[in-house]
Amino acid sequence: MVVNIESGPLESFLMKHVIFDCDGTLIDTSARQYQLFAGIKELIQELSPHCLLYVWTARGRSSTLRILEELGVSTYFDGVSAWEDSLPKPHVEGLQNLVGLFPRDSVCVIGDSPNDIIGAKNFGVLAIGALWNKEAQRDFLEDSGADFIVSHPSECSKLIEQNLKAE
């Protein structure tokens, strides 16, 4: 796990915590050259002043960090849990490593796959299903227990504001 939290421990407990899946949620891996999905950078920039942001991925750590750096968003993230850091999704170990100390009602996961949603629900946090990836399927996200399903990153901010508590 890589963590570079700038705020102190007390401030961390007073913030909301948003965990993004990497491939298919943050990054469009179907493109010839990896790119952020439309609206993702704006969402990250909007959330970062009042949320701690993390990446929970089945991708390797060095690859994840390199891609986030190349796409100009690495500095927005306070932690990364990659495949070598924990048991594979949907196991909750990666989430525990990232935000295990924080109240569950201050945490959400945004992901495009059933494993993202199942992991979030097993961990006891809000799960937002992301449909902006053309491979994502609404019925799979619904069947996995997503609390909300959204079609564009811009829909996430209001849900996070209304449904997460900053303790």
Name each model feature, range by range.
Residues 2-38:
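Active-site neighborhood of HAD-like aspartate-dependent phosphohydrolases
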Residues 13, 49-51, 101-106, 163-167:
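Glycine-rich phosphate-binding loop signature in dinucleotide/nucleotide-binding domains
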Residues 26, 53, 109-110, 149:
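Conserved SAM-binding loop
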Residues 34-55, 61, 65, 92:
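Short, acidic loop-to-helix structural element flanking the phosphoryl-transfer center
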Residues 41-49, 99, 117-122:
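Surface-exposed amphipathic alpha-helices with a cationic face
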Residues 74-89:
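A short, structured active-site edge motif that brings together acidic residues
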Residues 89-119:
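Conserved Lys-Pro-Asp/Glu-containing loop-to-beta segment of HAD-superfamily phosphomonoesterases
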Residues 108-148:
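Acidic, Mg2+-coordinating phosphoryl-transfer loop and its flanking beta/alpha structural elements
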